């Protein structure tokens, strides 16, 4: 029992001493001791010389607590970061042993002490917050360790590769470097290794997700010497949800809307032209709005490829009706119709004259019409209105005569007369078929029917190729 009490007394003694010291420091009667200590530390302190001047380089440890990433701008190629930036180093000139506690001093004391000449290499604009006072902290430890903290908002350059935009990933860095001191005078390191940077996992961005981050320590060589550099690199993955709702879905719906013209009657010119022009102008507006939110870069982005593809489909749908309109209502079909009617009239007149010249006492050789069958004749006449058919040439039946030879038996003569009569009857029937007028086109054209299938199939294939390529 005695031994246990002794052990308890031994272990509790330092705690009691610390409590007494703390109380003595806070005691107004002992405030003079603290004041004397601070005055002694600052008296004769030369801010122009680094710690251990002429000796080994000063080791400066860095800590960053990220408060927020306020903005990532593709137009300016930068991002804005608010952070608590802390640096720690040992300055033996500031060590003390009279007070066994840390001294947190007024931020204005920092102007009287040596601090590292740290700067952000890729910084565009930075400032230290000053509400309600300048956000700086100076804390001294008995062994001379100095902790210097700042609350900083910095806008930092981030060179982005937007070829896969908006399906891209970007690497943005924060480069920390000494401006004047070389590696002979100062060294930088991450204080706490992988735990030197905190707050990254708590950050939420509207268009990005922080996939990963890494800490880098290196030395860079310039003409003036070798300098220490620390790098904090963020890997940002863009969230595609916003762009699907704002760009991709409207483009898809507008492209599908342009196909409605394939189901509108081809003679409804006003409706089809208005629909085509409206969809083309809408796609142009989407393209223009997108360009305003992005920098003027020389290469083609992924979203440019998609919008360009949608624009081509919409524009081709408008050209499809221009083709249909020309085929059905242009001058070409009218000329074909008139030429076909003229040829049919001439053929009918020629056959009528040739039939009247037939003599039953002559040996007549009738060659058949150069029409394969009645169905082919009907299709040829009906096909005059087909835009893909060329001008059909109607050849009259060639009728050849030759002088009668030796007299034949009357039986054969009668048979020949009956055969000639049948031929004449069939010729008249076929000739009458050539007089059929070209009917008015009231059915949907074959081009429209094929377009209803061709456009959706090709657009679906385009989407499959696009998403497989850029997502993977």
From Swiss-Prot:
Glycans are attached at residues 30, 102. InterPro entries: GABAA/Glycine_rcpt (IPR006028), GABAAb_rcpt (IPR002289), Neur_chan_lig-bd (IPR006202), Neur_chan_lig-bd_sf (IPR036734), Neur_channel (IPR006201), Neuro-gated_channel_TM_sf (IPR036719), Neuro_actylchol_rec (IPR038050), Neurotrans-gated_channel_TM (IPR006029). Histamine binds at residues 119, 178-179, 224. The chain crosses the membrane at residues 240-260, 271-290, 309-329, 451-471. 4-aminobutanoate binds at residues 179, 224. Heteropentamer, formed by a combination of alpha (GABRA1-6), beta (GABRB1-3), gamma (GABRG1-3), delta (GABRD), epsilon (GABRE), rho (GABRR1-3), pi (GABRP) and theta (GABRQ) chains, each subunit exhibiting distinct physiological and pharmacological properties. Interacts with UBQLN1. May interact with KIF21B. Identified in a complex of 720 kDa composed of LHFPL4, NLGN2, GABRA1, GABRB2, GABRG2 and GABRB3. Beta subunit of the heteropentameric ligand-gated chloride channel gated by gamma-aminobutyric acid (GABA), a major inhibitory neurotransmitter in the brain. GABA-gated chloride channels, also named GABA(A) receptors (GABAAR), consist of five subunits arranged around a central pore and contain GABA active binding site(s) located at the alpha and beta subunit interface(s). When activated by GABA, GABAARs selectively allow the flow of chloride anions across the cell membrane down their electrochemical gradient. This is Gamma-aminobutyric acid receptor subunit beta-2. It comes from Bos taurus (Bovine). The gene is GABRB2.
């Amino acid at each position: 029992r005695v031994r246990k009490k002794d052990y308890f007394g031994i272990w509790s003694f330092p705690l009691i001493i610390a409590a007494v010291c703390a109380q003595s420091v806070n005691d107004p009667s002992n405030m003079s001791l603290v004041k004397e200590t601070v005055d002694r530390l600052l008296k004769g302190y030369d801010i122009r010389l680094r710690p251990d001047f002429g000796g080994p380089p000063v080791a400066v440890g860095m800590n960053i607590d990220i408060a927020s990433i306020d903005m990532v701008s593709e137009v300016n190629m930068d991002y804005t970061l608010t952070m608590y930036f802390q640096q720690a180093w040992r300055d033996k000139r500031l060590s003390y042993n009279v007070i066994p506690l840390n001294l947190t001093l007024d931020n204005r004391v920092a102007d009287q002490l040596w601090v590292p000449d740290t700067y952000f290499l890729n910084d565009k604009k930075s400032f230290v917050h000053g509400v309600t006072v300048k956000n700086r902290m100076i804390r001294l430890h008995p062994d001379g360790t100095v902790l210097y903290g700042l609350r900083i908002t910095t806008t930092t350059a981030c060179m982005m590769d937007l070829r896969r935009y908006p399906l891209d990933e970007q690497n943005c860095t924060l480069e920390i470097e000494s401006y004047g001191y070389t590696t002979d005078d100062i060294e930088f390191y991450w204080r706490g290794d992988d735990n030197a940077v905190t707050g990254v996992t708590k950050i939420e961005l509207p268009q990005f997700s922080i996939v990963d981050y890494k800490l880098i320590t290196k030395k860079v060589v310039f003409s003036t010497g070798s300098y220490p550099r620390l790098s904090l690199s963020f890997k940002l993955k863009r969230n595609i949800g916003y762009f699907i709702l704002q760009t991709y879905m409207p483009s898809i719906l507008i492209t599908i809307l342009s196909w409605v013209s394939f189901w509108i009657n081809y003679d409804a010119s006003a409706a089809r032209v208005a629909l085509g022009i409206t969809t083309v102008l809408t796609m142009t507006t989407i393209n223009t709005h997108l360009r305003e939110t992005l920098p003027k870069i020389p290469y083609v982005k992924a979203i440019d490829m998609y919008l360009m593809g949608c624009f081509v489909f919409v524009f081709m749908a408008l050209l499809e009706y221009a083709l249909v309109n020309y085929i059905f209502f242009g001058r070409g079909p009218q000329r074909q119709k008139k030429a076909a009617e003229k040829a049919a009239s001439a053929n009918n007149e020629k056959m009528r004259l040739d039939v009247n010249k037939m003599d039953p006492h002559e040996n007549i050789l009738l060659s058949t019409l150069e029409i394969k069958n009645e169905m082919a004749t009907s299709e040829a006449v009906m096909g005059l209105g087909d835009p893909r058919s060329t001008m059909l040439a109607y050849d009259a039946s060639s009728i050849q005569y030759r002088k009668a030879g030796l007299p034949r038996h009357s039986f054969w003569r009668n048979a020949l007369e009956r055969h000639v009569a049948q031929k004449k009857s069939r010729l008249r029937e076929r000739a009458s078929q050539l007089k059929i007028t070209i009917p008015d086109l009231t059915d949907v054209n074959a081009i429209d029917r094929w377009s209803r299938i061709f456009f959706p199939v090709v657009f679906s294939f385009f989407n499959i190729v696009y998403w497989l390529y850029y997502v993977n």
